[in-house]
């Protein structure tokens, strides 16, 4: 009789954690300032009512600028803050909802303007767009395939907000980061 003894293998798993970090930031906002006092002239509200509920004293609204320019400016500032060149980017993610164009995607406009040669896409995530973008960027980074990922969040809610609704209009401003 041949007896086969089970062989036991000791398998060790080693997990190497790749930690992603933010190495640069940039922001860009329109020049037009809309204060709570200005809103109180068209709404049944006051500076005190808005500030006590939101902490907001003013917001920026696009007038002579456009969202694309703000997004590109924020991207350039983030790259400069990170001491990085656009050619070093491995991916661009742009989180936004309100866009000037259906196509091309805002990320493609940013990519072309800064001279990047990497893949890019837009993510429509509304208020949580940055969080979703960060989670996707982390997954890309941990895959080992992408190292330098630019996330740009650009919004122009002033085009859609009901300026006669004091519960919503007091919350939103335009800009990019």
Q: Where does each model-flagged region fall?
A:
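Short glycine-rich or small-residue beta-strand-to-loop segments that form or flank ligand, phosphate
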Residues: 90-96
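Low-complexity, intrinsically disordered or signal/transmembrane-proximal segments
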Residues: 1-3, 7-8
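Conserved catalytic cysteine-centered active-site region
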Residues: 51-53, 57-68, 96-148
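Conserved beta-strand-centric core segments of catalytic alpha/beta enzyme folds
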Residues: 13-37, 134-177
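Conserved "HGTGT" condensation-loop signature of ketosynthase/thiolase-family condensing enzymes
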Residues: 10-90, 114-115
